[in-house]
Curated annotation (Swiss-Prot):
It holds the Pfam family DapB_N. Pathway: Amino-acid biosynthesis; L-lysine biosynthesis via DAP pathway; (S)-tetrahydrodipicolinate from L-aspartate: step 4/4. Keywords: Amino-acid biosynthesis, Cytoplasm, Diaminopimelate biosynthesis, Lysine biosynthesis, NAD, NADP, Oxidoreductase. Belongs to the DapB family. It comes from Salmonella paratyphi C (strain RKS4594). NADP(+) binds at residue 39. PROSITE patterns: DAPB. This is 4-hydroxy-tetrahydrodipicolinate reductase. GO terms for biological process: diaminopimelate biosynthetic process; lysine biosynthetic process via diaminopimelate. GO terms for molecular function: 4-hydroxy-tetrahydrodipicolinate reductase; NAD binding; NADP binding; oxidoreductase activity, acting on CH or CH2 groups, NAD or NADP as acceptor.
Amino acid sequence: MHEAQIRVAIAGAGGRMGRQLIQAAMAMEGVQLGAALEREGSSLLGSDAGELAGVGKSGVTVQSSLEAVKDDFDVFIDFTRPEGTLTHLAFCRQHGKGMVIGTTGFDDAGKQAIREASQEIAIVFAANFSVGVNVMLKLLEKAAKVMGDYSDIEIIEAHHRHKVDAPSGTALAMGEAIAGALDKDLKDCAVYSREGYTGERVAGTIGFATVRAGDIVGEHTAMFADIGERVEITHKASSRMTFANGALRSALWLKTKKNGLFDMRDVLGLDVL
């Protein structure tokens, strides 16, 4: 048994991502699984979290009450849905718990609530916790500065049939990285759908295309297309474990932070590159 530097609680323990997070927490050096949460009324309540995730007994029982486990964790990891995450955010803010938030689909009010909470607690909030995706975001900034003013920029993303928001949070983060490098606001230049007679492509826009099919874990491509050539920067995920490991790495990184809003690029130190 390794010595724990940080104790984590996992939201949505019975979901696809929740189970991966439990596996990662039980395997990662310096991390202790302190609590696992599911919604009230779930048939999984009372289960052993490790057995639920297929990695053996953990001694942590799946519960529905954050109040009941508030003394069992330091950082709360949440990859659920916006409404649930905001409820958890209020609890963590009240009790001084750090958060790692991988939930996507927040509206402006939800994002503002996260910003306000970060004045009191430490939060890592990222659209994607993969190391590769965050390296890609840095590459996109550099490509945009060189090619963005004369290229047609399109972002194509594909996910499994069960994903409920579109475009993905990662695709939006890609768009924001590109727009920011061009001194633009993504809200002013994004094109999210094309149908019927659209006319010619408007220069300076960033287009988005979405695929939902099968069990695709996550694929993202940014295209910089000019006459005669194009550059494509692509990331493909083959396992959710890459996201889970990134989230646990973020939780460890938060142990020295009292408050503030960070993203995965802060965790990886990419902003110094």
